[in-house]
Amino acid sequence: MTESAKPRLLLVARTRYELPLSPSLARKFSALGERFDVRVLATSADGGPHDDGTFRLVGRLPLLDGPLFYVLLPFRVRRLAREHRAAAIVTQSPYEAVSVLLARTGARVIVELHGDWRTATRLYGSPLRRAIAPLADAVGAIGVRRADAVRTISPYTSGLVRAIGVEPAAEFPAFMDFELFGARPPVPLPAAPAALFVGVLELYKNVDGLAKAWRLAAPQLPGVELRIVGRGSRRDVVEELVRDLPAQTTWTERLTQAEVAQALDEASCLVLPSRSEGFGRVLVEAFLRGRPAVAMGVGGISDIVEDGSNGLLVASDDELAAALVRLLTDRELAERLAAGARQAAERWLATPAGYAERMAAVVAP
């Protein structure tokens, strides 16, 4: 298909991109480029503005990043939509959708729902953001209801939009590149039991709950280690846990994907204590390495983890501690759940071309 014949698509998100793109993102946008004439309006990872002809990345100012982004977004969208002559605009949250609707471009507006928009103000950011939660809830609902189409990523997120009277146009996960995790067969569980957490150290990931659970579980698991990988605003919680349990807790701020795959091979299970998840990519990564999950049964986690089949689901921090003790002291249980985890991973795998094809079906009027 020639460039002139491709549908003109504008993607809008507050996502922070770095140029050049990582190999994984490059594959995703290359596949989208086969189907669409794509432009992206997002934010810059390094804080400065960039425009390479496909990605227009706006700069960021400390403390004012969020407010400025949304205040200026309708004007930026209107300008870029006109330049690009966009036939459709896809947003990665209902909040961006409202800004796009205010721009009144005439293009179709499609919302991608990656999670519960109501948690954005309650579990991310400052007390001020939590204070405006009721207003933000209402604004997000307007974005979902007024959009021309809504694409969800899981049964959980589909349920969220149906609860406010909207039927999703499609349900499929965002493209996730699992090549490094599925490239080789899983290895047996390690002889020395260990648990692994991989994620940002933020409120919605319930890092505080993880620390509480490990303090309860560790005395019952002599010689067993919790390995934490991540960085974020709750780092002080992890630092204190490492000080309190230095022989049973390690912390690494950042690993490459290949190193995360290796860390999973060296663990008996993944632990995911999140308070909210739209999907939970790290669960699929763990499953591909044949590692079961001990996780909170919230949001999209329950769409992936089947209690007693490929992991253990819990409802509280105390239950999380008990489940960790149970799995890390019962080799037979761990091996049975590990086998179930590897089988469960297959349903979540997709190629870049397959993802782009499904996006084309949603974008088509």
Where are these regions (language model features)?
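A charged, aromatic-enriched C-terminal amphipathic alpha-helix characteristic of glycosyltransferases
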Residues: 335-363
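Aromatic "clamp/platform" in nucleotide-sugar-dependent glycosyltransferases that forms part
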Residues: 275
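Nucleotide-activated donor-binding/catalytic signature segment of Leloir-type glycosyltransferases, i.e.
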Residues: 239-258
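Membrane-proximal helix-turn-helix segments that form the acceptor-binding/catalytic region
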Residues: 28-30, 75-79, 117, 130-150
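Short hydrophobic beta-strand element within catalytic cores of glycosyltransferases
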Residues: 292-295
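Conserved acidic donor-binding segment of nucleotide-sugar-dependent glycosyltransferases
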Residues: 307-308, 312-318, 326-332
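Carbohydrate-associated surface elements
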Residues: 156, 175
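Conserved donor-binding/catalytic core segment of Leloir-type glycosyltransferases
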Residues: 10, 151, 187-205, 211-215, ...
